[in-house]
Structures are given as structure tokens and as C-alpha cells.
């Protein structure tokens, strides 16, 4: 993205690269979150910062753009080093240009604001440092409203192992640092970043053929990634992505792997990860818009994710005061509702693809959980595959019987960015009520441990039941390997959703 401003004045830092200018003052929107212990939660006064890739990048001595549309200035940016010396990042008009607003503990991201599309923000500990979270042995909870996110959009909340200062101390060329949203990395080793490691990414830059604002450069930025929440109103996924090197590293060309390279699996990170999407696992009535779903995405919900010290990952939800466990899944020899080594192996066997252990699996991503990770909150559309991997049938040539291909109910013709941007510009996501602490401390949206009196509507992990036992509404009542109740409570019937899962509806 770029902006044109009339005033001509700039803060010059000629001795360093990836500089800072002040045509627009940089004021981080405040955002309150809570740190929890067994005795309760304490408010923390944080803020959010916009990623550097969205910012106006211009000549340090004028308002001439260094990056315009999806191309670099050949005069200011003949190579990576010269470009970084000549160009600066400017402050952001968060609400007016990017559609980013905060109120108390809530962050709202608008999809389209004037010419801007989407956004990516980080939670700050102070004005120049990202807030870091050690996930191992802890849980992370937040409220989310995805009611305004149709097919093709992704309101993503996740953690990455990027440097807390945005790489400012590690790379002398980076004068902007975390204050201006630098240092991003993830498991796709993105090559669309304008600056990496304090230098520009202009060498080898190829403007996108289908996106007027982006391109692919000669370098990428890799690090471990934990996708807590990738979702719209139709589908949601929880996915760990390990990298051979936990922290941020720069890669070159197609050896980066990931979305931006011809060799997707040629890098040091796992671009696919080990995902848990209830719809993909056969539970097509757990999550979606309307009262026919266990979790109704027309309403706000609370998402609680727990990280055991062995690297396994558990999840439950709270909506309208009712607790919903992650639904059980039967995948090959695996039966349960936790991402662990057995599940990841069974998923790969059942659905195909590369082995989750190729880049170290849960043992490797657990190293990231044991260190500091930065919280990312974003909203985006997908110019690569139209978000079909999240909410539709993918690959699109798969048949109805292809294991793991059906990920959501969206049409395979949906999600085309040009159409989504034109038809749903007012889409938005709201993240709020962020809480973090030891397992059992965040209490969902109640401020206490999950209430024992709440109804758990997802399948229980029962090992048996008496012949007279009945299952509640939305509970599992049959399927391959199921040994729990097969009778439903009065008013409901046991309906077969697939060979592995029947549900009381």
C-alpha cells in the first residue's frame, strides 16, 4: 500500500537503512488484555502496531514513493542495500487509512477501507517491543466475532517466533524496529515482504499478475508459526507449523518453500502443518452460521486453546455461557480431540501429503512454545487459492469421497479476491477479551475456571455407558469405534454424518 501526502518534511537517519519518516505521526492504538493466574486475571495496558508491509514507503528526502502499486522505484531502489538507505517507513493513520480501531479490550479490523485491503497487527508490550508469550504449560483465550466474514476471507489470530524488537538490534540496517511493525516471519517464509533483515527485497522482485499491490521478491522470512485461529463464518482451523530453525531466518528464492515458491516443500518450514478443522474431520454441523450449528457464528464466541508441556494442543469454546469441547474425531487408528503425535500421524496417513515429522513435528514446534512468541491479528483474502483450503473443497478436482478434501461448505468458485473485495468490502472481524495464563486460569469469558455446571455439547471421551445412557443435543451417538451412548435425549435423533461420526440432532 502507499499513500500520497502534501507536506514535504522527513526525519532523516542517513547513517542507517530501513529508516523512519514522520509525515504521519505513529500512535499505537491502545488495547487492554489480561494476564491470569489461579487467583484471577489482571488487566494489562497494551497496544497494537501495523505491520511494515502495509505502510507508506517513500524517499527520506521527499514524498516520492519508493514503492508504488506493486513495483519499486528504479531510481531510489536499484538494489536491496541502496533502497534501504534511500527509503523510509512512515506512520499510520490506523482508522482512516487501514480501518483499524480499538475500544477497551476489542480490536476491529475492517476488510476494505478506501484503497486499502486487509491488515496485519501485532500486540505491543511497550512502544518499541512486541509482547511475547510463552505458550508451553499455558492457555490463551479470546473472544471473536466472525459474523461478517463470508467465504474467501480469513480472520487469523496466531503466534510467530519473530524478534521482540522487530529485528532492530540484530540487523543494524533496521532503524524502524517493532515500533513500525518490522521483522515479520512465518512458516510460509513469505517473499512478499518489502524489507527483510534491514534490507529491501527489491532484487528479483516480480510484481503479482493478479494483485495490484503485491509481488514476490528474491528473499523470504521464515520462523515457527502457531495458527490459533484461521476462520470465517463457515470454517475454522487450528494448526501448528514447525520450522527447523525456531526463530526468524532469511531464505533465498524457491529454497524458501511455502506459498510463494515453486517448490512448496523445499524450505526449512512446514507450510501445511498438522491442522484440526472440524468440518474436514467429518463434523459438518459443529461450526457455522445459524442455530442448526453447535457453535453459531452469527454470534460472538470464546476460544480457549491449551498447550501441554509435551507439545500437545487442546481446545474448547464457550458461547452463551455454554462450554463446547473440541469435537472428537476418528481418523484411522486415532480417536480423540487433541492435536498430538498420534493424531498428526493418523491425519497424514488418512489425507495424504507430507509427514508432519519432516520438519520436526510437535517436538520442534514445542521448542517455539517454550520460547517467546509474538501475537498476530489479521484479516486477509487469498490471491493464491481463494481460501479454498479453509472453507471449500480443495484441491478443487477432488471427488466427494476424497479423504480430507472437504474443508467447508463454500463453493469451489468462491473466494476470488476481486469479487470478495467488490461484493463484501464492509466485512470485518472483532477480536476481544484476550487472556493468557496457566492452564485453567483464563476461564473463557467468565473470568474463572470453566464452570462444571456448563453443558458440554461436543462428543465426550467416554469409554463406555450403560444401555440406558442418553446423549445430549449435538453429542456424538455413533460411528466407527464409538463406545459411548447411542440413544439421544428426548426430542433428538441420532443422524449419520459419515461412517466415523453420528450426532444427536
Curated annotation (Swiss-Prot):
Post-translational modification: O-glycosylated. O-glycosylation of the cellulase linker provides protection from proteolysis. Linker glycans also contribute to binding affinity of cellobiohydrolases to cellulose.
Signal peptide: 1-17
Domain named CBM1: residues: 469-505
Thermal response of activity: Optimum temperature is 50 degrees Celsius.
A GO molecular-function annotation: cellulose 1,4-beta-cellobiosidase activity
Biased composition (Low complexity): 447-470
Protein name in the entry: Exoglucanase 1
